[in-house]
Design a protein with these regions (language model features):
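A short helix/loop element that forms part of the nucleotide-sugar donor recognition site in Leloir-type
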Residues: 9, 197-211, 366
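Short His-centered aromatic/hydrophobic patch
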Residues: 105-110, 127-128
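Membrane-proximal helix-turn-helix segments that form the acceptor-binding/catalytic region
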Residues: 143-164
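Carbohydrate-associated surface elements
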Residues: 168, 190
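Conserved donor-binding/catalytic core segment of Leloir-type glycosyltransferases
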Residues: 212-228, 234-237
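Short alpha-helical donor nucleotide-sugar binding micro-motif in glycosyltransferases
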Residues: 279-280, 287-292
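Short hydrophobic beta-strand element within catalytic cores of glycosyltransferases
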Residues: 318-321
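Conserved acidic donor-binding segment of nucleotide-sugar-dependent glycosyltransferases
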Residues: 333-346, 354-360
Length: 393
């Protein structure tokens, strides 16, 4: 039976050093969905009863910014083999010297170098998404995608617990990877509520970022890859602009699809309606959400949670999402009007046009912010994850 965690009362400890240690292993600290979870656990797990150390592939200077509590495997310029060796050396030393009570893997490849050193009884996998399937969607060869899936399966099946972000990913872990349901725990993701609840007006946010004050703005914060649905969103914008000519779509993020997206906008005559922002600094991201009228999450495939939807709600801005993966689980409790009928361009256009013309009502800024604080705070996520960790101590 699949279980959603409840928050248990945390044990009391006299000092941080007396807490059981949870070693976190991942790709990145602070960037992307997985990296943000790692950073939030580093910040909030101690209050939930676990000391945290970790090792990641990037950034290079992570040791300096975390007081040595996180290490980089190797310089980001290093070869994959050198990163692999660095992971084995540094993780192996932490296992030997610090003896963590929990080994928490956020990415199967970088846990592979220490498979022979990890006891299955203390291994927890944080399942952020199907690496092999995502790489296939992004253009990897069948052989490469299959090899990645084998690495994933070997880790997930060894794990004492597998933490997933949604009911959709719980089903995927069981059906695709053969994880036993009684080992799966559902812990929704989180947003740093206080960081995104900037408490400024939309006008102030737009002035700060140099965005127009007199146009309705749609925002989409995405990696620029095909499954994120940006081609469909730009196609939908053609229909929206026919009814709301002053509409502006701001796309934030980087990726290999940038040139194709720009060409699609040009071909559809939307050069004045689409603005590509590229990478947006973490300090500016809360203001970017606040500047928008609607945050659009048009995912076409493989979305476990949808962190950008939770972040947007925390900023007080409604997020309209496709009914893909775990996205409906993020917004359904707030309003079903936040879900598109389908991921197709025509349904994206219909839903957004109805809102912009006042035919469909979305939750208010205050309702969005209150819902995010109640359901997606980082301390709440940390307490739920700590409860899972304690199950296997």
């Amino acid at each position: 039976m699949l279980q959603t965690t409840s928050t248990l009362e945390e044990p009391k400890y006299d000092s941080l050093q007396s807490l059981p240690l949870a070693l976190q292993i991942g790709i990145q600290y602070g960037g992307g969905g997985e990296g943000r979870v790692i950073a939030e656990l580093h910040k909030f797990l101690p209050a939930a009863g676990f000391r945290v150390l970790g090792a990641v592939a990037e950034p290079d200077d992570i040791a300096a910014s975390t007081r040595g509590e996180f290490l980089a495997f190797a310089p980001t310029s290093a070869s994959k083999l050198d990163r692999f060796r660095g992971a084995r050396r540094k993780l192996g030393r932490i296992l030997e010297v610090d003896r963590p009570a929990i080994v928490a893997s956020h990415f199967s490849l970088y846990s592979l170098p220490i498979y022979d050193k990890i006891s299955s009884s203390r291994l927890v996998t944080h399942f952020h998404g199907p690496w092999g399937a995502e790489s296939a969607q992004d253009g990897a060869s069948v052989l490469a995608a299959s090899a990645r899936m084998l690495v994933e399966k070997s880790l997930y099946r060894r794990s004492a617990r597998v933490i997933v972000l949604s009911q959709a990913f719980a089903k995927l872990a069981t059906e695709r990877y053969g994880v036993k349901p009684d080992r799966i725990r559902i812990v929704p993701g989180s947003a740093d509520i206080d960081r995104f609840a900037v408490g400024v007006t939309q006008r102030y946010a737009r002035e700060r970022l140099g965005l127009p004050l007199d146009r309705p703005i749609l925002l989409s914060v995405r990696r620029l890859v095909r499954r994120m649905g940006l081609l469909e969103l730009i196609t939908a914008l053609k229909q929206i602009a026919a009814r709301v000519p002053e509409i502006l779509l701001c796309i934030a993020g980087r990726g290999l699809l940038r040139q194709e997206l720009e060409q699609r906008a040009l071909d559809l005559g939307l050069s004045q309606n689409v603005q590509f922002l590229g990478f947006v600094d973490d300090d500016d991201l809360p203001y970017l959400y606040r500047a928008a009228d609607i945050n659009v999450v048009p995912t076409q495939a493989l979305e476990g949670f949808g962190l950008v939807a939770a972040e947007s709600l925390a900023a007080g801005v409604p997020a309209m999402v496709t009914q893909v993966g775990g996205l409906p689980e993020v917004v359904a409790g707030l309003s079903r009007n936040l879900m598109f009928a389908s991921p197709r361009a025509e349904d994206l256009a219909a839903g957004l046009t109805d809102v912009l013309l006042g035919r469909l009502e979305l939750p208010s800024n205050l309702e969005c912010a209150a819902y995010a604080r109640e359901n997606f705070s980082s301390p709440l996520m940390a307490n739920r994850i700590a409860a899972v960790y304690r199950e296997i101590l």
